[in-house]
Amino acid sequence: MAETILRLKGIRKELELSRDVRQTILPNLSLEIFEGEFVAITGPSGSGKSTLLYIMGGLDKPTFGKVWLDGQEITGLDEAEMTVIRNRKIGFIYQFHFLLPEFSAVDNVMMPMLIRRKYGKKEIRERAMKLLDMVGLEDKYTNKPNQLSGGQQQRVAIARALANEPKVLLGDEPTGNLDSRSANNVYELFARLNCELNQTVIVVTHDEDFANRAGRRIHLVDGKIESDSRTPRQATA
């Protein structure tokens, strides 16, 4: 049986709008994600999807409740400790790629590994090139972001997110700025990573096609899990 990679218990998130007014985003949410799952989180705007994702990734803290990542409770960690966890165990992909414009594709992918300092610079460069090969950009090593299409930029961002072999890959609307063809290519890449590498993938999306093709779909309404369903993994093209 697959191990639990992410566990959330009694998560409540409130925003302080003023001295006397608080808004509840997530009222009381508990959830387990298992190693090797491909999960889509859906729901209307304002349902708490991105807030939930950021709490999973340690980018935001719950008002109450606890989060465990890979068996370690992360809710009590300070920012310096959480930065180390994010660098080593979590890969993030956003709607906008956030690539450094002055650096090439391979340099952007190298950045997380240079920060971690687990490998020498030569090996880091070789690993970055292999990651770009894996996402189909073997001929774009030296291209800067402005020399790449939107879909190619997002694939560089995915390669960068994979640089330190994360336990969990988190995506916040990663296909939101892409045309349908590029969005499908990104989905196929996520599905391949999930199938071939057993990579745990959790994606917030408004894309119904993307969500329906994931192995598990969690639908939020008003910060509560309205449905949580698993489907047979669909074959990729």
Swiss-Prot record:
Cellular localisation: Cell inner membrane
Keywords tagged on the record: ATP-binding, Cell inner membrane, Cell membrane, Membrane, Nucleotide-binding, Translocase, Transport
Primary residence: membrane
Membrane topology annotation: Peripheral membrane protein
Classification via PROSITE patterns: ABC_TRANSPORTER_1, ABC_TRANSPORTER_2, LOLD
Main enzyme class: translocase
Binding residues annotated for ATP, in chain numbering: 43-50
GO MF term list: ATP binding; ATP hydrolysis activity
Pfam families: ABC_tran
Catalytic activity, EC: 7.6.2.-
SMART domains: AAA
Function statement: Part of the ABC transporter complex LolCDE involved in the translocation of mature outer membrane-directed lipoproteins, from the inner membrane to the periplasmic chaperone, LolA. Responsible for the formation of the LolA-lipoprotein complex in an ATP-dependent manner.
Protein name per Swiss-Prot or TrEMBL: Lipoprotein-releasing system ATP-binding protein LolD 1
Organism in which the protein naturally occurs: Chlorobaculum tepidum (strain ATCC 49652 / DSM 12025 / NBRC 103806 / TLS) (Chlorobium tepidum)
Lineage of the organism: Bacteria, Pseudomonadati, Chlorobiota, Chlorobiia, Chlorobiales
Gene name in the database record: lolD1
